[in-house]
């Protein structure tokens, strides 16, 4: 057991403050009425803040998530230690595009990794910088071609990502 168990608890109001002070708060400053998502890199945010704050993130922790999401993450070789806990899309431009990611959040202090396509800094707060991809896909889109599942499964991970863009 831990030696200083009590120090792991937050002071009154501290947990709520931590929950409400993540990158979601910076995303809300954008006042963007479109339906899109944001991805992040090493922001230190807590899980499920997007659900609480009313934003759309690529990060969540939900034990009854659709199994196809885990399957997709496995097929894309995303490093997800648990099937129901997703942190981000690994900063992969292709996956961000497919997931309708319009914004990318990093910590303000020091430059973090910003994927290709996020050229414009949309907003800066005390803690975060949010970049925008002006070519983000909408949340819903359709394909006019397809490949059989058997053929798809034989592709490498990079070929699978490329196939999803066709």
Sequence positions of predicted segments:
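Soluble catalytic regions of membrane-associated enzymes that act on cell-envelope
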Residues: 1-166
